[in-house]
Regions:
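Bacterial N-terminal signal peptides that target proteins for export
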Residues: 15, 31-40
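Bacterial N-terminal signal peptides
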Residues: 40-48
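N-terminal active-site segment of His-dependent metallophosphoesterases
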Residues: 51-138
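Active-site glycine-centered loops adjacent to acidic/histidine catalytic or metal-binding residues
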Residues: 65, 129-130, 164-165, 258, ...
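Extended active-site neighborhood of metal-dependent phosphoesterases/phosphodiesterases
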Residues: 136-239, 275-281, 287, 295-358, ...
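Short acidic, glycine-rich surface-loop motifs adjacent to enzyme active sites
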Residues: 247-264
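Histidine-centered catalytic micro-motifs
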Residues: 256-260, 286-296
Length: 384
């Protein structure tokens, strides 16, 4: 592993820093990526100073399946890759307006967030894979330009990106680019640890541990696939286990990956899913974040079939998928435009209460579909 000398996001460091700041003179929203303060310190303070009375006040976003470079050649008229990349940029503009949005007016999230102010600026945004459409060098360059790790305009909050099945194999430009990107984030203090090859990463925000395992948590290539193919998870399960071994069983953990957790999925096989479950079932996993399906969902892992196959005992974990930037289109029809102006899961943890709500930029901001009650979520993350 490639650890930092210390985790700059540790709770002890956070409290000692805040203790010498005057609340009257400090405003986290005046900090920028060019602040004379170190970038990691600036973003740390953003994540904790919005709610002075709370021991923890952490906000982060989940988006997925950007598919930069998608070319709708068969729509009428064709909607090319440059037009699609402009669509991505417009979606990012919408995302930049999420901070300051009032929470849903009713329901469990509204109740939990009463008196705690609107959506704060996030500590960061996680992009759960399929960053590009075909994983070539041009598409990677465009993704890295549109969503740089330092933060895209106008959001200016860090972007944590994962490789998906559209992003090519171990030697391809996307995974190679992610390695360089991760090294930059390590140097800036935005991640605490990288895997030996720098593809997988881990960091801590206000005592909440985040682990990025990219495509899915596994060791060894899928049967029949080449070592250099996208089917190589590059020892992500070993990395996950090594991180969890350093984390107490009751400490909150979030795991981010691309592939989904459905028992019907054939993208990663049953033995690998079981090995993953065995690795995490003794830990306080407060959220599993994923993409791949393009669906907006909140599910439980393991589902009933897998749960029975895994022995029928042990915890189940909450899984979240935010949707996609890439809409479905029909041959011979016009480009349909996005399903919503944007699709983003917004998470906030205040003290030991986690809330999650799906943001679409509809009137009022939040998802109002028939599935909205299922997507809205509140839970206590403290192990009793």
């Amino acid at each position: 592993m490639l650890p930092l000398p210390e985790d700059k996001h540790s709770p002890d460091n956070r409290y000692s820093i805040l203790s010498v700041l005057s609340p009257r003179s400090f405003s986290p929203y005046n900090l920028s990526m060019r602040s004379p303060l170190p970038l990691a310190l600036s973003l740390l303070l953003l994540g904790v100073a919005t709610c002075a009375h709370a021991a923890r006040d952490l906000t982060f976003y989940l988006v997925s399946d950007v598919h930069v470079g998608m070319d709708y050649r068969k729509t009428t008229p064709p909607f090319g890759s440059e037009a699609f990349n402009s669509h991505v940029a417009q979606t990012l503009e919408v995302l930049g307006k999420v901070p300051g949005t009032e929470w849903p007016p009713s329901g469990p999230v509204a109740e939990a967030m009463k008196g705690k102010g609107p959506v704060p600026r996030p500590a960061g945004m996680i992009v759960a894979g399929d960053l590009t459409e075909v994983g070539n060098a041009k598409q990677w360059q465009d993704f890295d330009r549109l969503l740089p790790w330092q933060g895209s305009t106008p959001g200016k909050y860090p972007t944590y990106a994962l490789a998906g099945n559209h992003d090519g194999g171990s030697a391809g430009p996307v995974r190679q680019g992610l390695r360089e990107r991760n090294r930059g984030m390590l140097a800036a203090g935005l991640v605490a640890t990288l895997s030996d090859d720098a593809l997988h990463s881990a960091w801590t925000w206000q005592g909440v541990h985040f682990i990025n395992v990219n495509l899915y948590p596994g060791d060894g290539v899928k049967a029949g696939a080449k070592e250099t193919s996208m089917w190589n998870p590059e020892s992500s399960l070993s990395f996950l286990k090594s991180r969890l071994a350093k984390i107490g069983a009751t400490e909150p953990v979030v795991i981010a990956m691309h592939l989904d957790f459905s028992a019907r999925s054939t993208w990663w096989d049953q033995p690998k899913r079981k090995a993953f479950y065995e690795a995490i079932k003794g830990h306080n996993i407060i959220a599993l974040l994923h993409g791949h399906t393009h669906d907006i969902t909140r599910l439980r892992f393991p589902e009933d079939k897998d749960y029975a196959d895994f022995g029928g005992t042990g915890p189940r974990f909450d899984c979240f998928s935010a949707g996609a930037f890439k809409p479905d289109a029909k041959d011979g029809k016009p480009f349909p435009g996005p399903r919503y102006p944007c699709e983003c899961y917004v998470f906030r943890i205040v003290d030991d209460v986690l809330v999650a709500a799906h943001y679409t930029a509809e009137p009022g901001g939040w998802n109002t579909s028939k599935h909205a009650p299922q997507l809205t979520f509140v839970k206590d993350i403290k192990v009793k």
